[in-house]
């Protein structure tokens, strides 16, 4: 089903996440995201960006509030709709999560596992699947590397493989958690340019977390600024003033850092966690 332009594809309603010791990882957050929007979550490490992304993807279920997705059974992400939601949602990770000894082609094909039944996963990939994978590999500029081992690639190339793996899912929403944090500035700009161009061409909604202000200004349709687990700015890139940007990175107290210093679900209430697996 093709969604209409400018239609909301995601709504957060008072979503919050608390740790077992009651410190807050994410304060109540409400947000609507449009079809085709390139939304950037901006803030320092520990600001709550990853927690927010994982709440959207269902890797962490909110302590309070709800994530609403039009077209999803019941309209809300919960334990019953989680599998269906993740099939609609592609994920790009900072650390790639590639299988180094496997080829680029096989790593990209892993993005289709959600479409295969338990028994079908035991059989070889079809020619159709492989051609589909080669198509997305070509889109990220790595066709000549399709049969190369993933661990033989540069960091930027590995991230392109991660993008291709997400794209083969044909997602309605693409989430990217600090996708260029470990790359040098030139490579980071190149990878984000690729991601932005693909999303705009496909009218694909993207929510990308970054800590680099200039990259956010260069690529975002809209910026959500987070600090200490709370939204402190929401607006277009040109509305992000130097003072607001500095405030996002102002030194935090030790107590505040504790409340949002890690987004690892291991420290969350057990009823609110989900296994960390790609979409």
Curated annotation (Swiss-Prot):
Keyword Cell inner membrane: yes
Biased composition (Low complexity): 253-262
Keywords, in A-Z order: ATP-binding, Cell inner membrane, Cell membrane, Membrane, Nucleotide-binding, Phosphonate transport, Translocase, Transport
SUPFAM superfamilies: P-loop containing nucleoside triphosphate hydrolases
Signal sequence extent: none
InterPro entries: AAA+_ATPase, ABC_transporter-like_ATP-bd, ABC_transporter-like_CS, ABC_transpr_PhnC, MetN_ABC_transporter-like, P-loop_NTPase
Catalytic activity: phosphonate(out) + ATP + H2O = phosphonate(in) + ADP + phosphate + H(+)
GO MF term (any one): ABC-type phosphonate transporter activity
Keyword DNA-binding: no
Superkingdom of origin: Bacteria
Description of how the protein assembles with itself and partners: The complex is composed of two ATP-binding proteins (PhnC), two transmembrane proteins (PhnE) and a solute-binding protein (PhnD).
Role this protein plays: Part of the ABC transporter complex PhnCDE involved in phosphonates import. Responsible for energy coupling to the transport system.
Family: Belongs to the ABC transporter superfamily. Phosphonates importer (TC 3.A.1.9.1) family.
Protein name: Phosphonates import ATP-binding protein PhnC 2
């Amino acid at each position: 089903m093709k969604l209409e332009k400018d239609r909301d594809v995601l709504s957060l309603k008072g979503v919050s996440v608390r740790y077992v010791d009651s410190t807050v990882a994410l304060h109540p957050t409400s947000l609507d995201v449009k079809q085709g929007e390139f939304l950037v979550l901006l803030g320092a490490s520990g600001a709550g960006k990853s927690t927010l992304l994982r709440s959207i993807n269902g890797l962490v279920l909110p302590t309070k509030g709800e994530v609403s997705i039009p077209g999803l059974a019941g309209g809300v992400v919960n334990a019953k709709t989680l599998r269906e939601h993740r099939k609609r949602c592609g994920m790009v990770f900072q650390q790639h999560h590639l299988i180094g000894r496997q080829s680029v082609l096989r790593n990209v094909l892993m993005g289709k596992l959600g479409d295969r039944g338990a028994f079908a996963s035991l059989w070889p990939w079809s020619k159709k699947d492989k051609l589909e994978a080669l198509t997305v590999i070509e889109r990220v500029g790595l066709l000549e590397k399709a049969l190369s081992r993933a661990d033989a690639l540069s960091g930027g190339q590995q991230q392109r493989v991660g993008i291709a793996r997400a794209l083969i899912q044909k997602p309605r929403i693409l989430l990217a958690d600090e996708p260029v944090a470990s790359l040098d500035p030139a490579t980071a700009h190149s990878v984000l340019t690729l991601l932005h161009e693909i999303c705009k061409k496909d009218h694909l909604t993207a929510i990308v977390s970054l800590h680099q202000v200039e990259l956010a200004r260069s690529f975002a349709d809209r910026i959500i600024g987070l600090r200490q687990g709370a939204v402190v700015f929401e607006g277009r890139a040109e509305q992000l003033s130097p003072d607001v940007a500095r405030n996002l990175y102002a030194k935090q107290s030790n107590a505040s850092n504790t409340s949002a210093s890690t987004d690892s679900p291991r420290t969350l209430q057990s009823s609110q966690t989900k296994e960390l697996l790609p979409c």
